[in-house]
């Protein structure tokens, strides 16, 4: 079976989203000043409407298809873990690279609602793609995602101008393992890197006394299906297990401001050509998604 690598297409390839044709259309997707201020103070922003019910259902169909371990396109994933949990009694599906495989998970990168918000939260700058992720916690036995900072896994790129968008494909609640945040923790600097699917609170050992006090008061970011949460790459976050009777599925889009460079002479993602240390991140696998000056 011949497989088309959708990373070669830098733009919408389906009718799932419509690209704005005017400045007014783009402005209709803008976050408020209050929302941007909240993000800058707390390091995250939750409850941003990102997908319609129709878009959610189409993306769920894509996810069901590619989650099959026997699917012929698995060679295009950067990483594929049908169960990444370190606890044998729980399951955490985690994969990177779905944008290369299905129309829906490709086109979410060019969702204008996402792009406008991402540009604003990065400082009204052009937005470049880093990579995507899928997280799936099945009912009753969905595993945890340990408290961590995203950038602790991304030190092979610099400077720190990265942003994460986490989008719910199911209602995300305390019961099914919603994201939790420590407000203001993006100002703590870079902490050691934990095992992502290991002990939930393993990061506690690396916190000072003041940080431990704040760590004891996490904010649960419960969101509805189709809503997104944005967070800074240094914001401390994690999620508990899914003890509910329903799945908790989500996709993640990781981006950075245009101009971020490689800080490694090793491959930045599995199967992707090396971007030499010191060179700008760009090309087939790291496309420019949105430039506010050109689009608006």
Q: Where do the protein language model's features map onto the residues?
A:
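A short secondary-structure junction signal
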Residues: 141, 146-149, 157-158, 175-181, ...
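Non-heme Fe(II)-dependent double-stranded beta-helix
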Residues: 2-42, 48-147, 153, 194, ...
């Amino acid at each position: 079976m011949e497989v088309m690598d959708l990373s070669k297409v830098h733009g919408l390839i389906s009718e799932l989203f419509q690209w704005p044709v005017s400045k007014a259309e783009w402005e209709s997707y803008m976050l408020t000043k209050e929302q941007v201020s909240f993000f800058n103070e707390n390091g995250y922003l939750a409850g941003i409407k990102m997908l319609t019910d129709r878009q959610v259902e189409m993306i769920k169909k894509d996810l069901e298809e590619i989650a099959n371990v026997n699917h012929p396109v698995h060679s295009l994933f950067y990483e594929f873990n049908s169960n990444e949990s370190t606890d044998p009694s729980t399951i955490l599906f985690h994969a990177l690279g779905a944008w290369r495989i299905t129309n829906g998970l490709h086109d979410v990168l060019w969702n204008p609602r996402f792009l406008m918000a991402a540009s604003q939260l990065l400082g009204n700058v052009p937005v470049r793609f880093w990579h995507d992720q899928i997280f799936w916690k099945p009912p009753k036995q969905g595993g945890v995602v340990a408290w961590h900072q995203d950038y602790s896994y991304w030190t092979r790129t610099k400077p720190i101008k990265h942003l994460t968008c986490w989008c719910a494909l199911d209602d995300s609640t305390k019961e099914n393992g919603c994201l939790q945040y420590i407000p203001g923790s993006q100002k703590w600097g870079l902490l050691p890197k934990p095992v992502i699917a290991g002990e939930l609170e393993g990061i506690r050992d690396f916190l000072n006394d003041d940080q431990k006090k704040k760590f004891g008061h996490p904010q649960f970011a419960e969101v509805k299906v189709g809503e997104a949460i944005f967070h800074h790459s240094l914001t401390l976050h994690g999620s508990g297990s899914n003890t509910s009777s329903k799945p908790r599925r989500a996709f993640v889009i990781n981006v950075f401001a245009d101009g971020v460079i490689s800080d490694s002479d090793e491959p930045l993602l599995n199967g992707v050509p090396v971007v030499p240390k010191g060179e700008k991140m760009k090309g087939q696998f790291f496309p420019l998604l949105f430039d506010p000056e050109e689009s608006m």
